[in-house]
Amino acid sequence: MSIRTRWAAIVAAAAVTACPAVYAAGASATLHHITGEGEAESVGTIRFADSEHGLIVTPALHDLQSRGLHGTHIHANADCGATRMGDHKMPGGAAGGHYDPEQTERHAGPYGDGHLGDLPNLTVEADGSATTPVLAPRLTVSDLAGRAVMVHAEADRYDDHGDHHHGKGGVRMYCGVIE
């Protein structure tokens, strides 16, 4: 974990601890495992709250299949359904691409000048849980209306020159519509 990622987690955790009522005006999403057939079992929630430093993203997830870092993004559409791509179905394809209202078409990470939907990587512990808050400094709760949050199978490298077309975080594994 980079020093920047650790610092963001520390700031987010401090803000959440100091202001537990901050979620009164926030948003949340219940995440489900997604397949080519649609949504399956729930794996918990992610809460979103504004702070003076940006958007605090607080996961309360369990029973995740893969440990380590996972790319996490805000996607353009409030739909986690599968879509057909050629001869197969893409889990979560209806969520569209990363939220990119300025149409930068750049995958520069949460601190760069690309997609606004790029969030810091989610940390999944050995027991399959993810509870470490992160900070998305360029987003606010008001940006989240009509969107979905997606957790991918692999860590995001925030690189437009990778060899994977699913946002550099691997296949889509978990999705939730933000409310």
Q: How would you name each of these model-derived features?
A:
Residues 2, 18-179:
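N-terminal leader/targeting pre-sequences
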Residues 1-11:
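Bacterial N-terminal signal peptides that target proteins for export
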Residues 10-12, 17-19:
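Sec-dependent N-terminal signal peptides
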